[in-house]
Amino acid sequence: MAINLYKTSIPSTRKGAVDSQVKSNPRNNLIYGQHRCGKGRNARGIITAGHRGGGHKRLYRKIDFRRNDKDISGRIVTIEYDPNRNAYICLIHYGDGEKRYILHPRGAIIGDTIVSGTEVPISMGNALPLTDMPLGTAIHNIEITLEKGGQLARAAGAVSKLIAKEGKSATLRLPSGEVRLISKNCSATVGQVGNVEVNQKSLGRAGSKCWLGKRPVVRGVVMNPVDHPHGGGEGRAPIGRKKPATPWGYPALGRRSRKRNKYSDRFILRRRK
């Protein structure tokens, strides 16, 4: 979808850039309310994830990540906005009367037909196992565990590439640059996730950020020593340390955060960038 630029009529909309209007008219049987509790706090009320709180109420759309309607073709009826993700979603009407939401593939328009199964064409929006795909296919919504549903490459503009198949495994290059092995029996959707221009979006003002449930980000150097290792000092003082630290005293800016000795390390051929 296109990006619309605000006219510079008032300061709050200067340099703002938003998505073109994609209406959302969700079906009642495909949505449900969710209780947003915590707002970044744990059971004792202590902040464990910063910069969270507030935000507009949302209805969760049930997305079909499994695509388990085998060999039943469906038609794209609507392309809708989803407040829970950057990607758009499509309402699919299947031939057996079933109606489901899926992630919007890039380039898909209303009226297109999609299908999932083992012997289906390699065309945009179709879902099939990796073993039936040719090398070099661009894919998204990739399963890690068989029949669990897609878990990889689901963000707006995300795309992975099938680069090798050997034995029982397929080798994928993920959007992060990581190269890893996945079972060839796992399914994926052909194509790239839509709304590629989302990285060009500029909210233009702090209030728009607040609607998303994101609170202001404050530098540690302007805090008190009790709140951050960088805090304290007279005036504009430096951080007073050789290297930056997180609010909890751990090394910041480049420290590996992945847990060591995970079972999935054996499947990662090259770490992400």
UniProtKB/Swiss-Prot annotation:
Residues 262-273 have a biased composition (Basic and acidic residues). SMART domains: Ribosomal_L2, Ribosomal_L2_C. Residues 224-273 are annotated as: Disordered. The keyword Plastid applies. GO terms for molecular function: rRNA binding; structural constituent of ribosome; transferase activity. It is found in: Plastid, Chloroplast. One of its GO terms (cellular component) is mitochondrial large ribosomal subunit. Signal peptide: none annotated. NCBIfam families: rplB_bact. Part of the 50S ribosomal subunit. Belongs to the universal ribosomal protein uL2 family. This is Large ribosomal subunit protein uL2cz/uL2cy. It comes from Piper cenocladum. The gene is rpl2-A.
